[in-house]
A protein has these predicted regions:
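Extracellular glycan-associated modules
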Residues: 24, 34-35, 39, 44, ...
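Extracellular carbohydrate-recognition regions
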Residues: 3-64, 183-191
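Short, aromatic- and glycine-rich surface loops/edge beta-strands on solvent-exposed regions
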Residues: 2, 160-165
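Short carbohydrate-recognition loop motifs
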Residues: 55-84
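Noncatalytic modules at the cell exterior or secretory-pathway interfaces
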Residues: 150-160
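Short, surface-exposed loop/turn motifs at beta-strand boundaries within globular domains
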Residues: 55, 66, 95-99, 158
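Extracellular beta-strand elements of beta-rich domains used
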Residues: 10, 19, 38, 143, ...
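Extracellular ligand-binding interfaces
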Residues: 75-151, 168-173, 178
Length: 191
């Protein structure tokens, strides 16, 4: 019976239907970081300002029960970013058609693009511009992993699980990032 239990647990591990990346904060084992022209810095507190002052982060209540974070990126000559990495790679190859579900709100922007990227190492990433609503309302954006794969991502060895990048001035709120199994052929991003 112990062998049967082991086989069942192995099969369960292979049948991933969702992966939490960010729910008001990075989901374990993820680590939050920012990237400026000075390099990466890990974010260990709820109220944070990057060493160059170009990125500010604060935490707030989303719909009274969940947490969310506010990000203010200042205009820069360099790409600035907020991301979530992990020491262990994430393998999505057991998922048939995974997609990222991002719940986000843009509060203010100079209309520069806000990019979403996922990385699997040096010269191995997929990056797309997010289709953001200027209405200052919460929106749920679906990003198929297949679109990121077409841009160069290898979904079997993800190490930077999500990255938001911009050179522009943008103030946005982030509630959640969840990788789900696509059950319909919908998406907010065509690839």
């Amino acid at each position: 019976q112990s062998e049967l239990g082991l086989i069942e647990s192995i099969n369960t591990v292979k049948q991933i239907d969702s992966v939490n990346i960010f729910l008001g904060a990075a989901a374990i084992p993820g680590e939050e970081f920012v990237l400026t022209e000075l390099g990466p810095e890990y974010v260990m507190v709820d109220e944070y300002s990057s060493s160059n002052g170009g990125i500010r982060i604060s935490r707030f209540d989303y719909l009274r029960q969940d947490d969310a974070k506010n990000f203010i990126l200042s205009k820069s000559n360099y790409m600035q970013a907020f991301g979530i990495s992990a020491k262990t790679n994430l393998d999505l190859s057991s998922m048939k058609s995974p997609y990222y579900e991002v719940v986000i709100r843009v509060n203010a922007s100079d209309e520069s693009p806000l990019y979403f990227s996922v990385s699997c190492g040096e010269n191995c990433q997929g990056t797309l511009a997010l289709p953001l609503s200027p209405s200052n309302a919460w929106q749920t954006i679906s990003i198929p992993v297949r679109c990121l794969e077409r841009e160069g991502l290898d979904k079997s060895q993800i190490n930077i699980r999500s990255l938001f990048l911009s050179q522009g001035s943008v103030n946005f709120d982030l509630h959640s990032i969840i990788i789900k199994e696509e059950n319909e052929s919908f998406s907010d991003i065509s690839c």
